[in-house]
UniProtKB/Swiss-Prot annotation:
Glycosylation sites: N61
Record lineage: Eukaryota, Metazoa, Chordata, Craniata, Vertebrata
Subcellular location(s) per record: Secreted
Induction statement: By activin.
Protein name, entry field: Noggin
Name of encoding gene: nog
Known partners and oligomeric status: Homodimer.
Organism expressing this protein natively: Xenopus laevis (African clawed frog)
The family this protein is said to belong to: Belongs to the noggin family.
UniProt keyword list: Chondrogenesis, Developmental protein, Differentiation, Disulfide bond, Glycoprotein, Secreted, Signal
SUPFAM superfamilies in the cross-refs: Cystine-knot cytokines
Amino acid sequence: MDHSQCLVTIYALMVFLGLRIDQGGCQHYLHIRPAPSENLPLVDLIEHPDPIYDPKEKDLNETLLRTLMVGHFDPNFMATILPEERLGVEDLGELDLLLRQKPSGAMPAEIKGLEFYEGLQSKKHRLSKKLRRKLQMWLWSQTFCPVLYTWNDLGTRFWPRYVKVGSCYSKRSCSVPEGMVCKAAKSMHLTILRWRCQRRVQQKCAWITIQYPVISECKCSC
């Protein structure tokens, strides 16, 4: 470890201690990443297992279905066949690490505004801009909560069948000091089609548009 890396590690430990405050609960984590004001539960769709409620081949005409979508088809989040780049649950940890190495978006104000000093209390002075930047980037990478997108198969009763959904990786702590985890903070809605049957006898079925929620932002939270 070179001298610069050693200093970053030492000052990071000093930041750990300096950010602690004597409050209950998890309030002492809020200096690095404030918790969102509310949770964002996304409920799984529950479908009747009886195949009698499935659309028939004639109901899956792609030209007609695209017309019913009225311009809402988003190829970045929707697909009619399973994309090759689909990730499994076991890949999310690796993806989380990869995205945190280069955090996207604007650096959080609470990190950008941090000042770092060295020396005794009576003779302390600010760190160089280069070292200060390294510390800020390190803190940002530790507290960054990227949205991890994977393709989800909704089944034949939805069109497009495959939708890209977001999740927040919660198997690591995202706060300094540790204690908080990444949780959903915001969502967006995709307009897709759902096959709905209103009666079992003399079935009356049709495609209807629905709003499908997808996590769009993750934040550090208690």
